[in-house]
Protein backbone atom coordinates (compact mmCIF):
# COMPACT_ATOMS: atom_id res chain seq x y z
CA UNK A 1 0.00 0.00 0.00
CA UNK A 2 1.20 3.50 -0.81
CA UNK A 3 0.78 6.16 1.84
CA UNK A 4 0.44 9.90 1.35
CA UNK A 5 -0.21 12.83 3.67
CA UNK A 6 -0.66 16.57 3.94
CA UNK A 7 1.53 18.38 6.49
CA UNK A 8 0.57 21.68 8.09
CA UNK A 9 -0.23 23.65 11.21
CA UNK A 10 -3.14 23.97 11.59
CA UNK A 11 -4.28 20.96 9.57
CA UNK A 12 -7.47 19.58 11.17
CA UNK A 13 -9.60 21.68 8.78
CA UNK A 14 -7.99 20.23 5.63
CA UNK A 15 -10.36 18.49 3.24
CA UNK A 16 -7.43 17.01 1.30
CA UNK A 17 -7.73 13.54 2.89
CA UNK A 18 -11.44 13.32 2.02
CA UNK A 19 -10.83 14.44 -1.58
CA UNK A 20 -7.79 12.25 -2.17
CA UNK A 21 -9.25 9.15 -0.50
CA UNK A 22 -12.40 9.50 -2.64
CA UNK A 23 -10.24 9.60 -5.78
CA UNK A 24 -8.16 6.67 -4.51
CA UNK A 25 -11.34 4.62 -3.94
CA UNK A 26 -12.84 5.60 -7.31
CA UNK A 27 -9.64 4.53 -9.06
CA UNK A 28 -9.37 1.34 -6.97
CA UNK A 29 -5.81 2.17 -5.93
CA UNK A 30 -4.05 0.51 -3.02
CA UNK A 31 -3.26 3.73 -1.17
CA UNK A 32 -4.18 5.93 1.78
CA UNK A 33 -4.02 9.71 2.27
CA UNK A 34 -4.00 11.29 5.73
CA UNK A 35 -3.20 14.57 7.46
CA UNK A 36 -0.29 15.24 9.82
CA UNK A 37 -0.12 18.11 12.28
CA UNK A 38 3.48 19.32 12.21
CA UNK A 39 4.47 22.02 14.69
CA UNK A 40 8.19 22.19 13.83
CA UNK A 41 8.96 22.49 10.12
CA UNK A 42 12.52 21.34 10.77
CA UNK A 43 11.05 17.89 11.46
CA UNK A 44 9.26 17.64 8.11
CA UNK A 45 11.64 15.24 6.36
CA UNK A 46 12.24 13.15 9.49
CA UNK A 47 8.47 12.75 9.93
CA UNK A 48 8.04 11.96 6.22
CA UNK A 49 10.61 9.16 6.49
CA UNK A 50 9.34 7.91 9.88
CA UNK A 51 5.82 7.55 8.45
CA UNK A 52 7.26 5.78 5.39
CA UNK A 53 5.36 8.07 3.04
CA UNK A 54 5.50 7.83 -0.73
CA UNK A 55 4.54 11.45 -1.14
CA UNK A 56 3.05 14.43 0.62
CA UNK A 57 1.50 17.81 0.17
CA UNK A 58 2.84 20.63 2.31
CA UNK A 59 0.88 23.68 3.41
CA UNK A 60 1.43 26.59 5.75
CA UNK A 61 3.70 27.24 7.42
CA UNK A 62 6.10 24.59 6.11
CA UNK A 63 6.55 25.23 2.38
CA UNK A 64 9.99 26.79 2.73
CA UNK A 65 11.11 23.90 4.97
CA UNK A 66 9.94 21.46 2.29
CA UNK A 67 12.14 23.18 -0.27
CA UNK A 68 15.20 23.57 1.94
CA UNK A 69 15.17 20.13 3.60
CA UNK A 70 14.41 17.91 0.60
CA UNK A 71 17.23 16.01 -1.09
CA UNK A 72 16.56 17.77 -4.38
CA UNK A 73 14.11 20.34 -5.75
CA UNK A 74 12.64 21.24 -9.10
CA UNK A 75 13.79 24.40 -10.83
CA UNK A 76 10.31 25.88 -10.41
CA UNK A 77 10.30 25.28 -6.64
CA UNK A 78 13.78 26.78 -6.36
CA UNK A 79 12.80 29.91 -8.29
CA UNK A 80 9.58 30.35 -6.30
CA UNK A 81 11.35 29.70 -3.01
CA UNK A 82 8.92 27.13 -1.65
CA UNK A 83 7.58 23.63 -2.29
CA UNK A 84 4.11 22.21 -1.74
CA UNK A 85 4.75 18.63 -2.86
CA UNK A 86 7.24 16.00 -1.73
CA UNK A 87 7.81 12.75 -3.64
CA UNK A 88 9.94 9.76 -2.65
CA UNK A 89 11.93 8.35 -5.58
CA UNK A 90 14.80 5.89 -5.15
CA UNK A 91 15.07 6.70 -1.43
CA UNK A 92 15.47 10.43 -2.15
CA UNK A 93 12.87 13.07 -1.37
CA UNK A 94 12.19 15.51 -4.20
CA UNK A 95 10.44 18.86 -3.69
CA UNK A 96 8.11 20.44 -6.24
CA UNK A 97 5.88 23.48 -6.41
CA UNK A 98 2.70 22.62 -8.28
CA UNK A 99 0.99 25.97 -7.72
CA UNK A 100 2.62 27.70 -10.70
CA UNK A 101 2.08 24.99 -13.36
CA UNK A 102 -1.39 24.25 -11.96
CA UNK A 103 -2.34 27.91 -12.22
CA UNK A 104 -1.05 28.13 -15.81
CA UNK A 105 -3.05 25.04 -16.74
CA UNK A 106 -6.17 26.57 -15.17
CA UNK A 107 -5.88 29.74 -17.27
CA UNK A 108 -4.66 28.09 -20.48
CA UNK A 109 -7.93 28.76 -22.30
CA UNK A 110 -8.20 32.38 -21.20
CA UNK A 111 -7.89 35.12 -23.77
CA UNK A 112 -4.26 36.18 -24.17
CA UNK A 113 -3.40 38.41 -21.22
CA UNK A 114 -0.82 41.17 -21.17
CA UNK A 115 -1.13 42.04 -17.49
CA UNK A 116 -2.58 40.65 -14.27
CA UNK A 117 -3.34 41.81 -10.74
CA UNK A 118 -2.76 39.52 -7.77
CA UNK A 119 -4.81 40.43 -4.71
CA UNK A 120 -2.83 39.54 -1.60
CA UNK A 121 0.81 38.78 -0.91
CA UNK A 122 0.46 35.44 0.86
CA UNK A 123 2.29 32.21 0.15
CA UNK A 124 0.67 31.44 -3.19
CA UNK A 125 1.18 34.96 -4.56
CA UNK A 126 4.85 34.27 -5.23
CA UNK A 127 4.04 31.13 -7.23
CA UNK A 128 1.35 32.91 -9.24
CA UNK A 129 3.58 35.92 -9.92
CA UNK A 130 6.36 33.58 -11.08
CA UNK A 131 3.95 31.69 -13.34
CA UNK A 132 2.57 34.86 -14.90
CA UNK A 133 6.02 36.38 -15.40
CA UNK A 134 7.19 33.15 -17.07
CA UNK A 135 4.47 33.80 -19.67
CA UNK A 136 5.63 37.41 -20.19
CA UNK A 137 2.59 38.80 -18.40
CA UNK A 138 3.11 42.01 -16.42
CA UNK A 139 2.24 41.50 -12.76
CA UNK A 140 0.93 43.96 -10.19
CA UNK A 141 0.46 42.82 -6.57
CA UNK A 142 -1.99 44.57 -4.25
CA UNK A 143 -1.91 43.94 -0.50
CA UNK A 144 -3.24 45.68 2.61
CA UNK A 145 0.07 45.70 4.48
CA UNK A 146 3.09 47.24 2.83
CA UNK A 147 5.50 45.00 4.78
CA UNK A 148 4.31 41.82 3.04
CA UNK A 149 5.12 43.39 -0.32
CA UNK A 150 8.83 43.76 0.50
CA UNK A 151 9.78 40.41 -1.05
CA UNK A 152 8.00 41.36 -4.31
CA UNK A 153 8.93 45.02 -4.82
CA UNK A 154 12.21 44.35 -6.68
CA UNK A 155 10.49 42.24 -9.36
CA UNK A 156 6.88 43.38 -9.56
CA UNK A 157 4.77 46.51 -9.37
CA UNK A 158 3.28 46.63 -5.86
CA UNK A 159 0.66 48.72 -4.07
CA UNK A 160 -0.81 48.72 -0.56
CA UNK A 161 -3.72 50.55 1.02
Give residue ranges: language-model regions.
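Residues at the starts of beta-strands that form the adenosine-phosphate
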Residues: 3, 32, 115, 137-140
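NAD(P)-binding Rossmann-fold cofactor-contacting core
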Residues: 135-155
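Short acidic low-complexity segments
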Residues: 41, 154-161
